[in-house]
Swiss-Prot record:
The keyword Transmembrane applies. Residues 35-55, 107-203 are extracellular. The lineage of its organism: Eukaryota, Metazoa, Chordata, Craniata, Vertebrata. This is Tetraspanin-9. The keyword Transmembrane helix applies. The chain crosses the membrane at residues 14-34, 56-76, 86-106, 204-224. InterPro entries: Tetraspanin/Peripherin, Tetraspanin_animals, Tetraspanin_CS, Tetraspanin_EC2_sf. PANTHER family: TETRASPANIN, TETRASPANIN-9. It is a multi-pass membrane protein. Residues 1-13, 77-85, 225-239 are cytoplasmic. It comes from Xenopus laevis. It comes from the Eukaryota.
Amino acid sequence: MARGCLCCLKYMMFLFNLIFWLCGCGLLGVGIWLSVSQGNFATFSPSFPSLSAANLVIVIGTVVMVTGFLGCLGAIKENKCLLLSFFIILLIILLTELILLILFFVYMDKVNENAKQDLKDGLLLYNSENNVGLKNAWNIIQAEMHCCGVTDYTDWYPVLGENTVPDRCCMENSQDCGHNSTSLVWKTGCYEKVKMWFDDNKHVLGTIGMCILIIQILGMAFSMTLFQQIHRTGKKYDA
C-alpha cells in the first residue's frame, strides 16, 4: 500500500514538474521575443539598465525551467542528488522571497523615494537616440494608465521644456497636443497610478502569491518524501 502511494506520488511530482518546466520554457520564449522586439518593454531605470521586462522574464523563465527539469528527472529517476538539489533551490527561492518582502515593508518609504528619483532621472533619457525603448515604454504606460510623468506632469518640464509634455499625456491625443498646454493633460503621476493599480488588485495578487507559496511548499514536501524513502530503502522502488 505504502509502495503504491509512493509510486503515485512519484508520477504526480513528475507530471507537476513537467508542467512547471513547460511554463518555464514558455516564459523563456516570451522573454527572448521581448528582447528582440522593438524595445517597447525597456527598463525605466538608468541605475539598472539590465532590469528590463524582457530580462526579468528570461531570468524567471530560466529558473523555473531548470527547477522543473531537476524535479522531473529527480522524480522519474529516483535520484537523491537531484531531489535534494530541487529541494535546496526551492528553499533558496522561498527564503529569498521572504527576505525581499520583509526588506520591502521595512524600508518602504525609502524604496518609494529612491524609485521616484531614479524614474525621474530616467526621464532625461527620453529623447536619447539609444533609448528608443524607454521612450516607447513611457508613451505606452502614459496612454494606457492615463497618467503623466512620475509624480505629475511637471516632471517633464526639465526634459522637454516649460509647459511641454509628451503627446501621450494628453486626454485626447493629437499631434503636438502636449506643447504649451497643460489644461488637457493627465494630472496624476504614473507612479501613483501604478500604486493604485496594485492596491485595486491586491486580493488577486495576494491569491497568486499564496498559490505560488503553496506550490513551493508542496514541491519541497514531495521531494523530501521521495528522498527519505529512497534513503531508507537504499535502492530504487519499481514503478
